[in-house]
Amino acid sequence: MAMWRSSDSMVYLPPPSVAKVVNTDDYVTRTGIYYYAGSSRLLTVGHPYFKVGMNGGRKQDIPKVSAYQYRVFRVTLPDPNKFSIPDASLYNPETQRLVWACVGVEVGRGQPLGVGISGHPLYNRQDDTENSPFSSTTNKDSRDNVSVDYKQTQLCIIGCVPAIGEHWGKGKACKPNNVSTGDCPPLELVNTPIEDGDMIDTGYGAMDFGALQETKSEVPLDICQSICKYPDYLQMSADVYGDSMFFCLRREQLFARHFWNRGGMVGDAIPAQLYIKGTDIRANPGSSVYCPSPSGSMVTSDSQLFNKPYWLHKAQGHNNGICWHNQLFLTVVDTTRSTNFTLSTSIESSIPSTYDPSKFKEYTRHVEEYDLQFIFQLCTVTLTTDVMSYIHTMNSSILDNWNFAVAPPPSASLVDTYRYLQSAAITCQKDAPAPEKKDPYDGLKFWNVDLREKFSLELDQFPLGRKFLLQARVRRRPTIGPRKRPAASTSSSSATKHKRKRVSK
């Protein structure tokens, strides 16, 4: 007897439809109007290793300024919808809005090339594991005064939101009751925005040294209590809308100069099957926690990423250079100009004629010099229903800045309305104050650069503007002096040639 039964195979339903992310070129129309904008000379001076507090309260503290810090410039642009446009018929303010598109950038760097070093007067360095005749097994204080030259890094990231950094921090154990004092803490990958003044990866890794190294002597002074961040290129490249990184330039260089091991008790003992026990001084193996000293090697002008223009034709993400909210975030690192100045002053009113180190004070300072130049293209956005719906899904605050708002749903409740609003017989009828617009990056540190009054249409009056006109093959018209008249056109027909007649004598 035949019996029907359902199939044992699984039935797979199609996945739900996902909203498609489109490129900004699909709904942003570019015009032929370009503007130049540039900052003034940007300078900063400070101590390269730590912040110096000033006693008395009259003077401000000396900030920490190091070549191994991120410089994150928050560039503020004027609102193009409130801008003086040369062509009034360029767009319709009732159905369109204007936005800026960054098409060119040049980051200028002053100061000569140089190598700066950092160090620690009590660096945890036990043995020279490269050339040591034997390993020390004592747990005495073997810290030494050591200095290193960090990894060489050049970096430039541009976007309309801050760049994202990653580092390893102290995680939370699943069973905290089973964690004993002295156990290795769990690690957790943390993503945070890169702020101005954050330390870069110097060759010791991207991690929270203050939380994971309690000896305060495993790394140099400037990072022993800091968080070193590394740009999360994977996350920024996978950004849905492509706002965090239009494009990036980077160059890293590193090699290991010296090889040491760490002092202290080894937390993870070497398994016995990995070695044969020795005798005498080899009876107990030394520390197996090894570490190199990083070095960035030679600095040369042949490998410079700065002081040259870059043109953005196609971004790596869906945002092709559109500056939403009229702002840009420029993240810069340049360790090829990391020279630290050494200053010396006499503690006496007159400089001693004989050198005595106890009569002089030594100081160290680091200086940085920047110059930012941009080329912006004026663009229009036609406010159709689909475009406004897409922008509202992407970032609703963009429409708020354009004075568009979503109508609230109708209220089913009855609203009370008093007749005499100023009467003392009723409660106060003052309207609630309108909520202030909150900065989404409030609490984050950036180097603010205001370009709202530094836009110009005269591109040929500025260095980057002339470079842009050259690469765009735009011929500049003369503004003064006589202009050459066009040459008269010549007839294609050739002049009639007269034949010579041969006359017989």
Swiss-Prot record:
GO terms for cellular component: host cell nucleus; T=7 icosahedral viral capsid. Residues 475-486, 496-505 have a biased composition (Basic residues). Residues 118-143, 475-505 are annotated as: Disordered. GO terms for molecular function: structural molecule activity. The keyword Nucleotide-binding does not apply. It comes from the Viruses. Its main location: virion. It is found in: Virion; Host nucleus. Coiled coil: none annotated. GO terms for biological process: endocytosis involved in viral entry into host cell; virion attachment to host cell. InterPro entries: Capsid_L1_Papillomavir, Capsid_L1_sf_Papillomavir, dsDNA_vir_gr_I_capsid. Keywords: Capsid protein, Disulfide bond, Host nucleus, Host-virus interaction, Late protein, T=7 icosahedral capsid protein, Viral attachment to host cell, Viral penetration into host cytoplasm, Virion, Virus endocytosis by host, Virus entry into host cell. HAMAP family: PPV_L1. Forms an icosahedral capsid with a T=7 symmetry and a 50 nm diameter. The capsid is composed of 72 pentamers linked to each other by disulfide bonds and associated with L2 proteins. Binds to heparan sulfate proteoglycans on cell surface of basal layer keratinocytes to provide initial virion attachment. This binding mediates a conformational change in the virus capsid that facilitates efficient infection. The virion enters the host cell via endocytosis. During virus trafficking, L1 protein dissociates from the viral DNA and the genomic DNA is released to the host nucleus. Self-assembles into homopentamers. The capsid has an icosahedral symmetry and consists of 72 capsomers, with each capsomer being a pentamer of L1. Interacts with the minor capsid protein L2; this interaction is necessary for viral genome encapsidation. Interacts with protein E2; this interaction enhances E2-dependent replication and transcription activation. Belongs to the papillomaviridae L1 protein family. This is Major capsid protein L1. The gene is L1.
